[in-house]
């Protein structure tokens, strides 16, 4: 509601300024333009504005550009990596289980003296080995090759 009042005030003040300053400008400025009036245009009020129909206007058919069809899910093993993926090969576990090294590491982490040592528990599935495959991980090339 406040915006409507401000807008109305601005329109009225701009019209008042136009009428006031339009009647006080020199004669040679009134005659400049494409048309020279033998009278002051403000003397007869506002000039009529051509009416345009309100509401939605019917439009003709518009041409449609062909859209690329979305590709269905493809098997990652069938995709061939392109040359732009040459520097982004990362070997990851493709078997779906946790990979542990086949040999235990010899380095023991140092723990504070107040903690109780617990022996490491072997995870199931580690004895079965890990299958590793090359995956192209960075965004331009998210393609996995068959596991080795």
UniProtKB/Swiss-Prot annotation:
Residues covered by region (Repeat-rich region): 46-75
Biased composition (Pro residues): 52-73
PTM (free text): O-glycosylated.
Keywords annotated in UniProt: Glycoprotein, Repeat, Signal
Residue span(s) of the pro-peptide: 19-43
Sequence repeats, residue ranges: 46-50, 54-58, 59-63, 64-68, 71-75
Keyword Transcription part of the UniProt annotation: no
Signal peptide bounds: 1-18
Keyword Glycoprotein appears in the UniProt entry: yes
Chain positions covered by the region annotation Disordered: 52-80
Protein family (similarity comment): To B.pahangi filarial sheath protein.
Protein name per the record: Major microfilarial sheath protein
């Amino acid at each position: 509601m406040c915006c409507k009042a401000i807008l109305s005030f601005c329109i009225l003040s701009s019209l008042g300024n136009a009428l006031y300053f339009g009647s006080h400008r020199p004669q040679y400025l009134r005659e400049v333009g494409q048309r020279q009036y033998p009278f002051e245009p403000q003397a007869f009020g506002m000039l009529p504005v051509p009416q345009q129909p309100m509401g939605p206007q019917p439009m003709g058919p518009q041409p449609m550009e062909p859209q690329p069809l979305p590709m269905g899910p493809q098997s990652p093993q069938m995709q061939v990596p392109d040359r732009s993926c040459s520097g982004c090969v990362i070997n990851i576990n493709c078997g779906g289980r946790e990979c542990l090294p086949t040999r235990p590491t010899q380095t023991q982490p140092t723990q504070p003296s107040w903690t109780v040592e617990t022996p490491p528990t072997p995870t199931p599935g580690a004895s079965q080995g890990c299958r590793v495959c090359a995956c192209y991980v960075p965004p331009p090339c998210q393609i996995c090759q068959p596991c080795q």
